[in-house]
């Protein structure tokens, strides 16, 4: 249980084990949070949070402590099994600490051997049914614009295609669970890899700007604070520099939820409302019709890349994750949606 300070965060050499999760979470909270230093196990309440399909999240709170501190209670994230194969933890750490120092996101307390701990952002995580509401769209669009306007001390090369290729290379020829191999073969991974090559060339023609992106704006990663009428983003695991169109198109895909129900994909009117608020917040000017049309085409064409990104992600997760979620079915749903919309979106002009 040795600890050391590194930059503006601490590293605690401690592993939360499966057989003693609650005890481990209490130890982590006591170590990192000064206000909880003297809290006993029975003082700390632990609530498992919904929404994560890469890691497991817990809210830890001492209800005896006056809630005047900005980032109490705290969230403890336990990394998913072999999640380091899909997450660049070093890059995530740089982004997490920089975001904390720039007031973007929650206070970051530090790392332990199989997870991290950060402050709780006041508000409610949105449900996928919420993010299509016009008032929520405005809040989310403004926050995305803020993200896209900041500078981070990481490489400014877009991470989309290298990440897709990395994950695709991890996809097996034969699925390791024999009874699921026939279903896996129906996905036709090799064909999806070829689609990725074609799409990379097509989307390059859009010259989508490279900006700092969250890259995972599903509803559960968006916290709405009604007292301030604003949205904040959490969970920066996939954050990196990327194409603007990917951030926007990926978010529109998330209207469908984990189901996913793509009948909920936003129509053009809904997208234009969102993109208008985004443009106003980012550029401080009213967008022209041509600018909105360009954003609309860019977003929808990059939504195709989002399906490839999360489709290959799901295949890797299906082989490794111990979270109760049907990743293989989800991955196939993303690839199926890619084919359903490919020609329609690539023909937009």
Swiss-Prot record:
Annotated transmembrane regions: none
Catalytic activity: ethanolamine + ATP = phosphoethanolamine + ADP + H(+)
Database matches in InterPro entries: Kinase-like_dom_sf
Pathway annotation from the record: Phospholipid metabolism; phosphatidylethanolamine biosynthesis; phosphatidylethanolamine from ethanolamine: step 1/3
Any one GO CC term of the record: cytoplasm
Pfam family, one: Choline_kinase
Enzyme Commission number(s) of this protein: 2.7.1.82
UniProt keyword annotations, A-Z: ATP-binding, Cytoplasm, Kinase, Lipid biosynthesis, Lipid metabolism, Nucleotide-binding, Phospholipid biosynthesis, Phospholipid metabolism, Transferase
SUPFAM superfamilies: Protein kinase-like (PK-like) (SSF56112)
UniProt-listed Gene3D superfamilies: 3.90.1200.10, Phosphorylase Kinase, domain 1
Stretch forming the signal peptide: none
Molecular-function GO terms, alphabetical: ATP binding; ethanolamine kinase activity
A biological process term (GO) from this entry: phosphatidylethanolamine biosynthetic process
Localisation per UniProt entry: Cytoplasm
Enzyme class (EC, first level): transferase
Sequence similarity: Belongs to the choline/ethanolamine kinase family.
Function of the molecule: Highly specific for ethanolamine phosphorylation. May be a rate-controlling step in phosphatidylethanolamine biosynthesis.
Protein name listed in UniProt: Probable ethanolamine kinase A
